[in-house]
């Protein structure tokens, strides 16, 4: 008896504990510890088919020749459940306007060349003017391969200060209602809600981490989005020209 169409053990590998309970067991997620609370993220949700009249998801060039930015975050763990995240973000048409997450992808079991090829395909569909990549681990291979066809790619070398700058920028944008994504893409909200305040191993510096077990999701879509949003400086004016972000 009962439903035998799903492999619950496999689903537990693919989702973080919070995501599993919220998406599959219909339990409400406690967001008190999250940097990005659910209420803030709900304000970013729109019906993209109704609101984004200039975006046509099924077209050969979904956004025509308007510019977009790409953010990528590599898989950090060693288990099958860990995934890399990639987002296509439309920057504001006017200063202080809204960012829109047009596409998001999570890649599991793909080597760095396959992931770089997937990013290259996005550059053939969109007018990509910026790509930001965390070069940690597998990310370094992706970064080197992307650099071959997109030399201006920005490399993020993670440390607590870089994480702080990324989160600060994203929080400023989200809290001012300057980010939009489709309401059906609940994985984006889950990803941001997984980011919590923490301290470094020495215990004397604040940083941020994703709440996850080693085999689960690690907020890849949120970090990927932050790599794209960071192309707008904290002042929200013109893009920074440095190709490597490494702050000590």
Q: Where do the protein language model's features map onto the residues?
A:
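Short, solvent-exposed helix-loop connector elements
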Residues: 201-215
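Phosphate/oxyanion-binding active-site loops and adjacent basic polyanion-contact surfaces
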Residues: 79-84, 108-115, 217-221
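Short, flexible loop/turn elements at secondary-structure junctions
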Residues: 28, 45, 73-78, 108, ...
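Mg2+-dependent endonuclease catalytic cores in nucleic-acid-processing enzymes, primarily RNase H-like
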Residues: 93-204
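Acidic two-metal-ion nuclease catalytic site recognized across multiple nuclease folds
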Residues: 104, 219, 226-248
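Gly/Thr-rich phosphate-binding beta-strand-loop-beta motif of the actin/hexokinase/Hsp70
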Residues: 63-92
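ATPase catalytic-site recognition across NTP-hydrolyzing enzymes
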Residues: 1-74
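Structural motif
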Residues: 161-162, 211-220
């Amino acid at each position: 008896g009962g439903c035998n169409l799903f492999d619950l053990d496999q689903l537990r590998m693919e989702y973080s504990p919070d995501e599993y309970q919220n998406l599959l067991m219909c339990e409400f997620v406690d967001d008190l510890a999250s940097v990005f609370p659910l209420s803030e993220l709900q304000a970013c949700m729109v019906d993209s088919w109704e609101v984004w009249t200039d975006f046509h998801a099924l077209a050969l060039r979904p956004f025509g020749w308007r510019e977009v930015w790409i953010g990528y975050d590599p898989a950090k763990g060693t288990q099958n459940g860990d995934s890399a995240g990639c987002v296509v973000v439309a920057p504001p048409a006017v200063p202080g306007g809204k960012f829109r997450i047009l596409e998001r992808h999570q890649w599991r079991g793909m080597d760095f060349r396959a992931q770089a090829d997937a990013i290259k395909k996005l550059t053939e569909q969109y007018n990509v003017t910026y790509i930001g990549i965390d070069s940690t681990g597998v990310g370094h291979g992706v970064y080197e391969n992307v650099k071959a066809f997109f030399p201006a790619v920005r490399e993020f070398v993670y440390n607590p200060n870089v994480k702080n700058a990324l989160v600060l920028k994203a929080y400023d944008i989200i809290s001012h209602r300057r980010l939009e994504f489709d309401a059906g893409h609940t994985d984006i909200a889950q990803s941001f809600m997984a980011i919590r305040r923490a301290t470094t191993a020495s215990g004397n510096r604040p940083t941020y981490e994703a709440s996850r077990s080693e085999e689960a999701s690690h907020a890849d879509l949120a970090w990927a989005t932050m790599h794209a949003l960071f192309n707008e400086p904290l002042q929200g004016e013109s893009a920074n020209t440095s190709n490597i972000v490494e702050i000590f």
